[in-house]
Amino acid sequence: MPPRLIVFDLDYTLWPLHVDCSVTPPLRKDSKGRIVDLHGQKVRVFPDVPEILERLKREQYALGVASRTDDPDTARQLLGLLDWNKYFSYQEIYPGCKVGHFNKFASRSGIPYKDMLFFDDEHRNIRDVSKLGTSHSSTCSGG
């Protein structure tokens, strides 16, 4: 049975950086439409991610993001600049154990943990959330 909610971590899962220490906010688009930080450093995503998100949306999966970042504002800003908010109906972006994030997903969506699939690059997050009964996959530090 396919998952009813697919949840992604952000840092080193959807993009190859930590938003709380790898870039300097504010982020913006430059004259060529590239996303850059305060110093002009380009901010990139893993190459296959946009196509994957578009396909999942087309196939009508519910999607969420769960991030423990210490800079939720910059993470949200990057999601907005990428125009990715359209993909993620559920967003829990704040420091803390991801069990709390998933408790909110279950409460807000009505979807049981067993029907959620979680992608993350950090084993501790996968270990914590798997105790709830979610399915999971490690991204091996990216993409």
Across the structure, where does each feature detected by a protein language model lie?
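Surface-exposed amphipathic alpha-helices with a cationic face
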Residues: P50-R58, A106, I126, S130
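Acidic, Mg2+-coordinating phosphoryl-transfer loop and its flanking beta/alpha structural elements
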Residues: Y113-G143
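Short, surface-exposed basic-aromatic patches at helix termini and helix-loop junctions that form
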Residues: G80-W84, R108-G110, V129-S135
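Short loop-to-alpha-helix "cap/lid" segments that border enzyme active sites
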Residues: G96-R108
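Structural signal for hydrophobic/aromatic residues that build the beta-strand cores
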Residues: Y12, F102, F118-F119
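Hydrophobic packing residues within well-ordered alpha-helices of enzyme cores
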Residues: A75-L79, F102, V129
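Alpha-helical substrate-recognition element adjacent to the catalytic core
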Residues: M1-G96
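Short helix-loop-beta connector
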Residues: M1, P112-Y113
